[in-house]
Amino acid sequence: MTEEIIIAGFGGQGVLSMGKILAYSGIMQDEEVSWMPSYGPEMRGGTANVTVILSDERISSPYLKVYDTAIILNQQSMDKFEKSVKPGGVLIYDPNGIVMHPTRTDIDIYQVEGNRLATEMGNKKVFNMIVLGGFLKIRPIVKLDNVIEGLKKSLPERYHNLIPLNKKAITKGMQNIFLYNVENQLTNHL
């Protein structure tokens, strides 16, 4: 099994953290892992993306042009990466701020309203964990226990008190991801 993922959005949305947590989770499952970040010079507000590859075989190259899954968090990333999803692949996105929704009919498209749900939870910083939860519902490639361990490894120890909140956010994302129908733009709860 090999899963090639691109996660893309604005800096400050937790794009790189989401990728790092997936990478740590894969390592804990004895998988081959690649984590390749890319970002502009801005600390926040610029675009950022990370390619994560999890595989039970050796990874020949971390550089990819097409992906099994794209997790899209802003319009610029939608414009850039929608066409990079392999036919039969998955595109997951937060519709907040998306003006031009995906149009491909040869991939499975899902929405998870991470921004709205994080606001409802009272902490916008868990946005990325909600989206990660949605991804894990659709592509359960790593065990939830390993994701929590990945959180512990990626969060500084002074923030470990936030792990229960992050776990709750992941669960909320798993419960709130919808299939997006390109033809009539309806979403169906999974």
Language-model-derived ranges and their functions:
Residues 1-190:
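Active-site cofactor/cluster-binding pocket
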